UniProtKB/Swiss-Prot annotation:
It catalyses: octanoyl-[ACP] + L-lysyl-[protein] = N(6)-octanoyl-L-lysyl-[protein] + holo-[ACP] + H(+). It comes from Burkholderia pseudomallei (strain 668). One of its GO terms (cellular component) is cytoplasm. Catalyzes the transfer of endogenously produced octanoic acid from octanoyl-acyl-carrier-protein onto the lipoyl domains of lipoate-dependent enzymes. Lipoyl-ACP can also act as a substrate although octanoyl-ACP is likely to be the physiological substrate. GO terms for biological process: protein modification process. This is Octanoyltransferase.
Length: 252
Protein backbone atom coordinates (compact mmCIF):
# COMPACT_ATOMS: atom_id res chain seq x y z
CA UNK A 1 0.00 0.00 0.00
CA UNK A 2 1.57 3.29 -1.04
CA UNK A 3 2.42 5.61 1.73
CA UNK A 4 0.52 8.89 2.06
CA UNK A 5 2.25 11.88 0.52
CA UNK A 6 4.10 14.02 2.95
CA UNK A 7 2.25 17.09 4.12
CA UNK A 8 3.54 20.29 2.58
CA UNK A 9 5.87 22.24 4.77
CA UNK A 10 4.28 25.10 6.59
CA UNK A 11 5.23 28.45 5.08
CA UNK A 12 7.83 30.36 6.98
CA UNK A 13 6.53 33.11 9.16
CA UNK A 14 6.91 36.45 7.39
CA UNK A 15 9.52 38.83 8.61
CA UNK A 16 7.42 41.58 10.10
CA UNK A 17 10.09 44.20 9.57
CA UNK A 18 10.42 43.30 5.89
CA UNK A 19 6.74 42.90 5.11
CA UNK A 20 5.46 46.24 6.38
CA UNK A 21 6.13 49.08 3.96
CA UNK A 22 7.37 52.20 5.72
CA UNK A 23 5.11 55.21 5.58
CA UNK A 24 6.44 57.83 3.17
CA UNK A 25 7.53 61.04 4.84
CA UNK A 26 4.80 63.63 4.94
CA UNK A 27 5.24 66.29 2.28
CA UNK A 28 5.96 69.72 3.65
CA UNK A 29 3.43 72.28 2.48
CA UNK A 30 4.30 75.07 0.07
CA UNK A 31 2.13 78.15 -0.36
CA UNK A 32 2.19 79.64 -3.87
CA UNK A 33 1.43 83.34 -4.24
CA UNK A 34 0.74 84.78 -7.69
CA UNK A 35 1.61 88.45 -7.33
CA UNK A 36 1.16 89.67 -10.90
CA UNK A 37 3.18 92.73 -11.90
CA UNK A 38 4.82 94.12 -8.77
CA UNK A 39 7.62 96.67 -8.33
CA UNK A 40 10.91 95.07 -7.35
CA UNK A 41 11.39 97.14 -4.19
CA UNK A 42 8.05 95.99 -2.79
CA UNK A 43 8.96 92.32 -3.24
CA UNK A 44 12.45 92.82 -1.86
CA UNK A 45 11.17 94.45 1.32
CA UNK A 46 8.41 91.86 1.72
CA UNK A 47 10.82 88.92 1.31
CA UNK A 48 13.11 90.20 4.03
CA UNK A 49 10.20 90.94 6.36
CA UNK A 50 8.72 87.48 5.77
CA UNK A 51 12.06 85.79 6.45
CA UNK A 52 12.70 87.81 9.62
CA UNK A 53 9.21 87.10 10.97
CA UNK A 54 8.94 83.39 10.13
CA UNK A 55 8.98 80.73 12.84
CA UNK A 56 9.82 77.00 12.67
CA UNK A 57 6.13 76.42 11.87
CA UNK A 58 5.86 78.92 9.01
CA UNK A 59 5.05 77.24 5.70
CA UNK A 60 7.50 77.67 2.87
CA UNK A 61 6.31 79.91 0.05
CA UNK A 62 6.96 80.51 -3.64
CA UNK A 63 6.12 83.97 -4.95
CA UNK A 64 5.61 84.28 -8.70
CA UNK A 65 5.90 87.78 -10.09
CA UNK A 66 6.65 89.91 -13.14
CA UNK A 67 8.63 93.10 -12.52
CA UNK A 68 8.70 96.44 -14.31
CA UNK A 69 12.17 97.09 -15.80
CA UNK A 70 14.91 97.05 -13.14
CA UNK A 71 18.56 96.10 -12.75
CA UNK A 72 19.58 94.39 -9.52
CA UNK A 73 23.15 94.19 -8.25
CA UNK A 74 24.17 91.49 -5.76
CA UNK A 75 25.81 92.32 -2.45
CA UNK A 76 29.31 91.59 -3.79
CA UNK A 77 28.48 92.92 -7.24
CA UNK A 78 30.74 95.26 -9.18
CA UNK A 79 28.91 98.41 -10.37
CA UNK A 80 31.26 98.49 -13.37
CA UNK A 81 29.17 95.68 -14.87
CA UNK A 82 26.48 98.32 -15.54
CA UNK A 83 27.82 99.59 -18.86
CA UNK A 84 25.29 102.36 -19.53
CA UNK A 85 24.65 104.54 -16.50
CA UNK A 86 21.87 106.62 -18.08
CA UNK A 87 19.82 103.76 -19.56
CA UNK A 88 16.66 104.94 -17.82
CA UNK A 89 16.31 101.60 -16.01
CA UNK A 90 16.66 101.90 -12.21
CA UNK A 91 19.40 100.01 -10.36
CA UNK A 92 18.68 98.39 -6.99
CA UNK A 93 21.47 97.04 -4.77
CA UNK A 94 20.32 93.86 -3.05
CA UNK A 95 21.61 91.26 -0.60
CA UNK A 96 21.55 88.15 -2.80
CA UNK A 97 24.62 86.48 -4.21
CA UNK A 98 25.81 87.14 -7.73
CA UNK A 99 26.46 90.17 -9.87
CA UNK A 100 24.10 92.28 -11.98
CA UNK A 101 21.00 91.09 -13.81
CA UNK A 102 17.89 92.54 -15.43
CA UNK A 103 14.23 91.92 -14.66
CA UNK A 104 11.40 93.10 -16.88
CA UNK A 105 8.06 92.33 -18.52
CA UNK A 106 7.87 88.93 -20.16
CA UNK A 107 10.17 87.33 -17.60
CA UNK A 108 9.03 84.95 -14.85
CA UNK A 109 10.54 85.67 -11.45
CA UNK A 110 10.01 83.06 -8.73
CA UNK A 111 11.10 83.79 -5.18
CA UNK A 112 11.72 80.75 -2.96
CA UNK A 113 11.18 81.34 0.75
CA UNK A 114 12.35 77.98 2.06
CA UNK A 115 13.41 76.70 5.50
CA UNK A 116 16.49 74.70 4.55
CA UNK A 117 17.00 73.27 8.02
CA UNK A 118 13.50 71.86 8.19
CA UNK A 119 13.90 70.28 4.75
CA UNK A 120 17.42 69.12 5.62
CA UNK A 121 18.80 70.82 2.52
CA UNK A 122 22.28 72.17 1.94
CA UNK A 123 22.44 75.38 -0.07
CA UNK A 124 24.16 73.63 -2.97
CA UNK A 125 21.41 70.99 -2.99
CA UNK A 126 18.71 73.65 -3.15
CA UNK A 127 20.49 75.39 -6.03
CA UNK A 128 20.78 72.09 -7.92
CA UNK A 129 17.09 71.34 -7.42
CA UNK A 130 16.09 74.78 -8.66
CA UNK A 131 18.28 74.33 -11.73
CA UNK A 132 16.76 70.91 -12.41
CA UNK A 133 13.25 72.38 -12.17
CA UNK A 134 14.14 75.02 -14.76
CA UNK A 135 15.78 72.48 -17.08
CA UNK A 136 12.66 70.28 -16.90
CA UNK A 137 10.39 73.27 -17.50
CA UNK A 138 12.29 74.24 -20.64
CA UNK A 139 12.33 70.62 -21.80
CA UNK A 140 8.52 70.65 -21.65
CA UNK A 141 8.71 73.20 -24.49
CA UNK A 142 11.33 71.21 -26.43
CA UNK A 143 14.19 73.45 -25.36
CA UNK A 144 17.42 71.71 -24.36
CA UNK A 145 19.31 73.47 -21.59
CA UNK A 146 21.96 72.75 -18.99
CA UNK A 147 23.75 74.16 -15.97
CA UNK A 148 27.31 75.42 -16.22
CA UNK A 149 29.99 74.70 -13.62
CA UNK A 150 30.88 77.79 -11.61
CA UNK A 151 28.18 79.92 -13.22
CA UNK A 152 24.76 79.54 -11.55
CA UNK A 153 21.87 79.70 -13.95
CA UNK A 154 20.68 77.79 -16.99
CA UNK A 155 22.15 77.96 -20.48
CA UNK A 156 21.02 76.88 -23.95
CA UNK A 157 22.59 73.51 -24.71
CA UNK A 158 22.50 73.33 -28.51
CA UNK A 159 21.87 75.24 -31.72
CA UNK A 160 23.05 78.66 -32.88
CA UNK A 161 22.45 80.17 -29.42
CA UNK A 162 24.35 77.47 -27.54
CA UNK A 163 25.78 78.90 -24.33
CA UNK A 164 23.30 81.78 -24.13
CA UNK A 165 21.79 82.35 -20.71
CA UNK A 166 18.05 81.83 -20.46
CA UNK A 167 17.56 81.71 -16.68
CA UNK A 168 19.34 83.37 -13.75
CA UNK A 169 19.55 82.33 -10.12
CA UNK A 170 20.59 84.06 -6.91
CA UNK A 171 19.77 83.34 -3.28
CA UNK A 172 20.26 84.80 0.17
CA UNK A 173 20.31 82.55 3.24
CA UNK A 174 19.37 84.10 6.57
CA UNK A 175 18.84 82.08 9.76
CA UNK A 176 18.76 78.89 7.72
CA UNK A 177 16.06 80.18 5.35
CA UNK A 178 16.31 81.25 1.72
CA UNK A 179 14.88 84.19 -0.14
CA UNK A 180 15.39 85.69 -3.60
CA UNK A 181 15.24 82.99 -6.28
CA UNK A 182 15.31 82.69 -10.06
CA UNK A 183 14.17 84.26 -13.30
CA UNK A 184 13.26 82.64 -16.63
CA UNK A 185 13.12 84.67 -19.83
CA UNK A 186 9.90 83.81 -21.68
CA UNK A 187 9.17 86.57 -24.21
CA UNK A 188 10.76 89.88 -23.43
CA UNK A 189 12.68 92.84 -24.75
CA UNK A 190 16.27 91.62 -24.47
CA UNK A 191 17.90 94.96 -25.29
CA UNK A 192 18.38 96.01 -21.62
CA UNK A 193 20.76 93.05 -21.20
CA UNK A 194 23.09 94.77 -23.70
CA UNK A 195 23.69 97.55 -21.17
CA UNK A 196 25.20 95.15 -18.61
CA UNK A 197 27.64 92.29 -18.29
CA UNK A 198 24.96 89.73 -17.36
CA UNK A 199 25.88 88.09 -14.05
CA UNK A 200 29.32 89.67 -14.42
CA UNK A 201 30.28 88.00 -17.72
CA UNK A 202 31.29 90.40 -20.49
CA UNK A 203 29.76 89.50 -23.83
CA UNK A 204 27.46 86.82 -22.44
CA UNK A 205 24.46 86.39 -24.74
CA UNK A 206 21.07 86.39 -23.06
CA UNK A 207 18.13 84.75 -24.80
CA UNK A 208 14.44 84.07 -24.20
CA UNK A 209 12.15 81.16 -24.98
CA UNK A 210 10.37 83.00 -27.78
CA UNK A 211 13.64 83.62 -29.63
CA UNK A 212 14.26 79.87 -29.51
CA UNK A 213 10.88 79.10 -31.10
CA UNK A 214 8.76 78.35 -28.02
CA UNK A 215 5.27 79.83 -28.27
CA UNK A 216 3.96 79.19 -24.74
CA UNK A 217 2.71 82.24 -22.86
CA UNK A 218 3.97 83.56 -19.53
CA UNK A 219 1.22 82.03 -17.38
CA UNK A 220 1.54 78.58 -18.91
CA UNK A 221 5.30 78.48 -18.41
CA UNK A 222 4.95 79.84 -14.87
CA UNK A 223 2.52 77.07 -13.95
CA UNK A 224 4.86 74.43 -15.35
CA UNK A 225 7.79 75.95 -13.47
CA UNK A 226 5.95 76.09 -10.15
CA UNK A 227 4.94 72.45 -10.40
CA UNK A 228 8.52 71.40 -11.12
CA UNK A 229 9.89 73.54 -8.28
CA UNK A 230 7.48 72.00 -5.81
CA UNK A 231 8.26 68.50 -7.02
CA UNK A 232 11.95 69.11 -6.44
CA UNK A 233 11.31 70.59 -3.02
CA UNK A 234 9.39 67.39 -2.14
CA UNK A 235 6.51 69.57 -1.06
CA UNK A 236 2.79 69.76 -1.74
CA UNK A 237 0.48 72.66 -2.42
CA UNK A 238 -3.18 73.17 -3.03
CA UNK A 239 -2.45 75.91 -5.56
CA UNK A 240 -0.30 73.64 -7.70
CA UNK A 241 -3.18 71.17 -7.99
CA UNK A 242 -5.76 73.74 -9.06
CA UNK A 243 -7.34 73.49 -12.50
CA UNK A 244 -5.64 75.55 -15.19
CA UNK A 245 -8.17 78.39 -15.15
CA UNK A 246 -8.15 78.71 -11.37
CA UNK A 247 -4.37 78.62 -11.26
CA UNK A 248 -4.15 81.49 -13.73
CA UNK A 249 -6.46 83.61 -11.60
CA UNK A 250 -5.14 82.80 -8.12
CA UNK A 251 -3.34 86.09 -7.59
CA UNK A 252 -2.82 87.33 -4.04
Amino acid sequence: MPSAPAAPAAPAAPDAAASVAPNPPAALPVTVRWLGETPYDACFDAMRAFTDARTPDTDDEIWVVEHPPVYTLGQAGNPAHLLVADSGVPLVKVDRGGQITYHGPGQIVAYLLVDLRRRKLMVRTLVTRIEEAVIETLAAYNLASARKAGAPGIYVESGPHRGAKIAALGLKIRNGCSYHGLSVNVKMDLRPFLAINPCGYAGLETIDMASLGATADWHEVAQTLVRRLIAHLDGATAAAALPQQALEQSND
